[in-house]
């Protein structure tokens, strides 16, 4: 039986666990959405597939698999739960491994840009971290001021999650960065842009 991983929305994908040949897979698909959302979803799937190809073989990144259609992206399901559910409080070892994972992602030139969302962080059955949902990511293989700024946004999002789930683990430096990140987030346009498009799709599809 398929298990939904995300609340269904008319303008968003279906995300659920499926089973194929005794293997649990995570499938994100727009195939059942209205035409306009389906076409936008096709572009998002193509982009996210490209990003996953840049992160191949990094522990904590789901393995990308062949998908049945251009509206769908399929990966290995990493198990466990996402941090939104708070089934288990992440400990210091978890966050240390998570920091190493984020650094590995950045070293490949990928910036996630939605690290404030606890649903994008996972904890597998062995307590190890993983990261999903790269649809809003950017790929900047070269260094420079823009990449440093966007990486800093990722780290601020990570610290916000850490502060929410286990604030006692924050160092003094991390606490100061968290406060600064909360202030700067008021100026960060990307979440507002996403909300704008969501409301736009809702109006169009009513």
Where are these regions (language model features)?
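Catalytic-loop of the protein kinase fold
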Residues: 107-123
């Amino acid at each position: 039986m398929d298990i939904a991983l995300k609340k269904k929305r008319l303008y968003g994908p279906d995300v659920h666990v499926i089973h194929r040949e005794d293997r649990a897979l995570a499938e994100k698909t727009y195939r059942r959405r209205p035409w306009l959302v389906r076409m936008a979803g096709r572009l998002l799937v193509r982009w996210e597939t490209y990003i996953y190809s840049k992160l191949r073989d990094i522990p904590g990144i789901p393995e990308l698999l062949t998908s049945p259609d251009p509206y769908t992206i399929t990966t290995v399901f990493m198990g466990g739960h996402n941090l939104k559910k708070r089934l288990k409080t992440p400990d210091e070892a978890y966050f240390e491994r998570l920091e190493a994972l984020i650094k590995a992602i950045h070293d490949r030139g990928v910036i996630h840009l939605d690290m404030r969302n606890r649903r994008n962080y996972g904890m597998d059955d062995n307590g190890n971290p993983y990261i999903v949902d790269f649809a809003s990511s950017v790929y900047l293989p070269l260094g420079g001021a823009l990449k440093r700024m966007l990486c800093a946004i990722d780290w601020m999002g990570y610290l916000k999650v850490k502060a929410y789930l286990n604030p006692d683990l924050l160092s003094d430096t991390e606490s100061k960065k968290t406060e600064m990140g909360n202030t700067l987030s008021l100026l960060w346009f990307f979440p507002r842009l996403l909300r704008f498009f969501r409301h736009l799709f809702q109006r169009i599809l009513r």
